Amino acid sequence: MSGDNQLGRLVILAGPSAVGKSTVVDRLRNDVPNLYFSVSMTTRAPRPGEVDGRDYFYVTAQEFQDKIDCGEMLEWADIHGGLQRSGTPAGPVNEARQNGRPVLVEVDLAGARNIASLIPDAETIFLAPPSWEVLVERLTGRGTESEDVIARRLETAREELAAQSEFKHVIINDDVDTAVKAIEDVLLGA
């Protein structure tokens, strides 16, 4: 890296299910020039229409374990009872930062904690709902999850909301344009 290259800012985004992370991330991908959005690595098979390197990096369980063993993962989790693994590979994030690009990583609470402990200069953002009632309404209004799944997600949301003080920035998503602008400001150091 040359002396005049500035390290790109790393922003970690977390928040409960149905808070609007996907909507905000989609807008940021279109609105922020040169943004690198971290692509997760997974051991699951690609779904129809998914592209390796765009949707996920698809690897075998052994390749994933090798990445962990070599310190090449910023965070990871066993999912579906350990049948699959998913996580954030360090290489692409570090490369984008070294090239001066702002980097956005969307992860869960545990992932945010892990990455922040490894990269202390990371900016952490918790995307919060305007109220608990709004979050419940958004989650149940989707109509895509069973009552059991909704109950589990709401319990997880309570834990996540209780931890929001761990984040450097808490942004209330009561208006998408305002939330996107606030995250852009953090990404670009405004």
Curated annotation (Swiss-Prot):
Entries under PROSITE patterns matching the protein: GUANYLATE_KINASE_1, GUANYLATE_KINASE_2
HAMAP family: Guanylate_kinase
Start and end residues of each Guanylate kinase-like domain: 8-188
Stored SUPFAM superfamilies: P-loop containing nucleoside triphosphate hydrolases
Residues involved in ATP binding: 15-22
UniProt keyword list: ATP-binding, Cytoplasm, Kinase, Nucleotide-binding, Transferase
PANTHER family attached to this UniProt entry: GUANYLATE KINASE, GUANYLATE KINASE-RELATED
Disulphide bond pairs: none
Family: Belongs to the guanylate kinase family.
Gene3D superfamilies noted in UniProt: Guanylate Kinase phosphate binding domain, P-loop containing nucleotide triphosphate hydrolases
GO cellular component: cytosol
Protein name stated in the entry: Guanylate kinase
NCBIfam families in alphabetical order: guanyl_kin
